[in-house]
Design a protein with these regions (language model features):
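Active-site groove signature of glycoside hydrolases
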Residues: 1-4
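Glycoside hydrolase catalytic-domain groove-lining segments
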Residues: 6-41, 46-49, 53-130
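Surface-exposed charge patches in extracellular/virion surface proteins
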Residues: 26-28, 197, 224, 238
Length: 264
């Protein structure tokens, strides 16, 4: 039903206060019922106080009241110059890596008190942003580049979005290729120093469509690697490819759930 929220209804609370109060309430209720809780958030709030304040979404604080947080880090949604990238839409791999590096920093600080923080399952772009002056066509190659960036940044899960629901399946893997990639990722991460693993039941690269295609709604594609690496288990701010270049011998892993301080 229609509702009007007037200034007097806020009782002095900010947008952030209202959002976090609600999230804390619903997280306790839903978890008590044995349910997992997730939320989609704007990607721009991760490293921008201006964007965070304007919509009331504070990334690290919201992550304390969720099991999964899904930042919408579509390269097309970043303005020219973001993360030092002239035209983010034209460099999907670099843009996703930059956004997830900032995500890791924010969640590192959010978890310094030893409390819970959500696992990260980012939204990736599977559409062409033709409204941008500086854009490129998105197809299987660009989808794969973004997925590779997720894995290289130490995360395992992702979602694809296309409002037209015309997904580029050639950017995804067959079960056989996904198994091979999972083994490669696990072997590569095992070479990294100070990395902790939380083994889970192996999963596959995405070949499934989530519910939500009813009544004209668009469906979303989701997937994850099968290594079970969790938030806080990868050297912060360090892409897999970069870490492999400097890694010599595996060091002593920290306790599960800990992480290194973020790099500059």
């Amino acid at each position: 039903r229609d509702a009007v929220f007037a200034e007097e209804d806020t009782k002095g609370r900010s947008r952030t206060d209202v959002i976090l109060n609600f999230m804390e309430y619903e997280y306790k209720k839903l978890r008590a019922a044995g349910l997992f809780v997730s939320a989609d958030v704007f990607g721009a709030i991760i490293n921008s106080d201006v964007n965070a304040d304007s919509v009331g979404q504070i990334y690290g604080e919201m992550a304390k009241h969720l099991d999964y947080i899904s930042p919408m880090i579509y390269p097309s949604h970043y303005s020219d110059g973001n993360y030092g990238i002239d035209h983010p839409d034209t460099r999907p791999y670099d843009t996703i890596c930059a956004a997830l590096t900032e995500s890791r920093k924010e969640l590192y600080f959010a978890g310094l008190d030893g409390g819970h923080v959500a696992a990260v399952r980012p939204w990736l772009q599977d559409f062409t942003a033709s409204w941008l002056k500086n854009h490129i066509p998105y197809g299987g190659e660009q989808v794969r580049d973004q997925i590779r960036a997720v894995y290289d940044c130490g995360y395992d899960e992702w979602l694809l979005w296309d409002a037209a629901c015309t997904y580029d399946w050639d950017g995804l893997l067959t079960p056989e290729a996904a198994d091979a990639e999972t083994e490669e990722i696990a072997a590569s991460r095992a070479m990294l120093p100070e990395t902790t693993y939380a083994p889970e039941e192996a999963g596959h690269d995405a070949l499934t469509v989530t519910e939500g295609a009813q009544n004209g709604d668009s469906a979303a594609v989701s997937g994850r690697a099968g290594t079970g690496l969790t938030v806080g288990d990868f050297p912060a701010g360090q892409a897999l490819s970069e870490a492999l270049e400097t890694a010599e011998e595996p060091g002593t892993p920290p306790e599960t759930g800990t992480t290194l301080p973020p790099t500059a």
